[in-house]
Regions:
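Exposed alpha-helical structural elements
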Residues: 1, 23-27, 35, 95, ...
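N-terminal basic, low-complexity leaders that serve as flexible interaction/assembly modules and, when applicable
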Residues: 1-80, 216-217, 295, 316
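Glycine-rich, aromatic-flanked loop segments that form ligand/cofactor-binding clefts
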Residues: 2-17, 58-86, 106-150
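Short, basic, glycine/proline-bearing loop/turn elements
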Residues: 27-39, 93-104, 241-242
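Surface-exposed, active-site-proximal loop segments in enzymatic domains
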Residues: 28, 76-80, 93-98, 143-149, ...
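Glycine-rich, proline-tolerant flexible connector loops at the mouths of alpha/beta enzymes
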Residues: 62-82, 86-104, 188-207, 307-309, ...
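Active-site loop segments of alpha/beta catalytic cores
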Residues: 107-317
Length: 317
């Protein structure tokens, strides 16, 4: 797909394909017994988890990690309980000034080992995907001190009323993300995806001022190194997404792929099956959703995926 060569069929992988929907994952985690923040530091175990979806016939393997992985070496440690909770929220300028830019070969070496291990196991049979959380998504977590889903309006207001704080935090996160993704590519990631998980909650003026510049810097830093996929969850600002330099756009289920294709015929599109249909729909509903999605792209420049990650309640079958 990214080499612009014909493929025999539309390739498919799923966000969060290695995780709690898989009984084998649940069994391994139960036997292991460690909290997630420790599991992510175990390269051998994380490699094993990453490879579980191979038996499903997916066309790519994404490494098993969390979008928050770079935060701990920055000085913003966290634990899973069961969702991630930071040791303390980052809400003061002196806290931002104390954040360090990690040195990936030293501070994130587990990720490098995972990617090397995946390539050693796969021997070129499947591409390996790396990823990172986008700076705004990471900033939301840091300011909230936990999952920000319930208080995004308050976070947006805080960031708008503290522009110097916001600029300094996003600058550190953008530098960290660029270094992190380039390190992943150096260690065997064939493609990388940037996850902005709350983009659908951000007003356009805020998005244009604070989100777009970091997306452009990060994705353009990847040029000629590896393809970059932008997942800006449910984001309606299509022209902004297209201007980032991304090689592919991962779209939510609320966006018509055919309309995107009309406007941007050469873009590689990833998506966009509603993850709730996969979790709650009948086999017929799932088949219909897949056919509709495939019909919209006619199988051209398309990676079949979901609107967001697999939901925990999704039946493994």
């Amino acid at each position: 797909i990214f080499n612009r060569k014909p493929v025999p069929r539309v390739p498919v992988w799923m966000m969060r394909q290695a995780g709690r929907t898989d009984p084998e994952y649940c069994r391994l985690r139960k036997e292991d017994g460690r909290p997630l923040e420790e599991v992510f530091l175990d390269a051998e175990f994380s490699t094993k988890i990453s490879l579980l979806p191979r038996r499903l016939g997916v066309d790519a393997i994404i490494m098993f990690q969390d979008i928050l992985t770079p935060l701990a070496p920055m000085g913003a440690g966290f634990k899973f309980n069961p969702a991630p909770v930071l040791h303390e929220p980052i809400i003061k300028m002196e806290q931002v000034r104390s954040l360090k830019i990690p040195n990936p070969p030293k501070d994130l070496k587990t990720v490098g080992r995972i990617l090397q291990g995946l390539n050693a196991e796969l021997q070129g049979s499947l591409p390996v995907l790396g990823f990172a959380g986008a700076p705004m998504t990471l900033a939301f977590f840091m300011i909230s001190g936990k999952s920000p889903s319930a208080n995004i309006p308050e976070i947006l207001d805080f960031m708008e009323t503290h522009p110097s704080f916001t600029e300094a935090l996003l600058e550190r996160l953008t530098e960290t993300t660029i270094d992190y993704l380039l390190y992943q590519i150096e260690n065997g990631a064939h493609i990388v995806q940037l996850f902005d998980s709350f983009a659908d909650k951000i007003p356009e003026p805020f998005y244009l001022r604070w989100v777009q510049p970091s997306h452009e810097r990060i994705l353009k830093s990847l040029e000629r190194r590896a393809p970059g996929i932008l997942f800006s969850r449910g984001c309606p600002y299509l022209d902004l997404l297209a201007a980032t330099g991304a090689d592919a756009l991962s779209l939510g289920d609320g966006i018509s792929i055919s309309k995107v294709r009309e406007k941007y015929p050469d873009f590689i599109i990833q998506g966009n099956i509603d993850n709730k249909i996969l979790a709650d729909g009948s086999p017929e509903m799932i088949s219909n959703a897949i056919r509709t999605c495939l019909d919209e792209t006619k199988g051209s420049n398309h990676i079949l995926n979901l609107s967001h990650g697999l939901l925990e309640r999704t039946p493994f079958e």
